[in-house]
Amino acid sequence: MKDNLLNKYKAKKTALVKDYDTSQAVNSFTLNGKLAWLDKATRVGLVNSLQIEKSANRDTTTLWLNGEQYILNIDLVLQMLVVLELYAKECYNVTEQHLNNIANETDLNRVYNYNYTKGYPERPAFNV
C-alpha cells in the first residue's frame, strides 16, 4: 500500500516537473523587457540563416518575436543564441536531475514536499 502511494506521488511529481520544464517559468527570456522564447528547432534554424546572411556580407537581420519586428546586428543575435542555447542546456540538466531525484527517492514525504522549481538558472535578459 505504501509503495503504491509512493509511486502515485512520484508519478504526480514527475508530471509537475515536466509541466514546469515546458512552462514560461523555464522556457523564456526577455528582450527589452518583453517575454519571448525560441524553441530548439528555431534556434538552430536561426543560426543557419544568420550564417548565410553573414556569408552574403549582411550586417543586420530581421528578427520577429511575438509579432514584433527587431532589426539587429547579426553578430549580436548569434551571441544571444549562444546564451539561449547554454541556458536551455542548463535548464535541461536541472530538469533531468529533478526527475532522477524523484525516481530514486524512497521517502513519501520527501517526494510530496520536493521542490522541483529550485536550481534553474536565471532567465536571460537582453536589452538592445
Language-model segments: residues:
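A preference for well-ordered globular domain cores
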Residues: 1-128
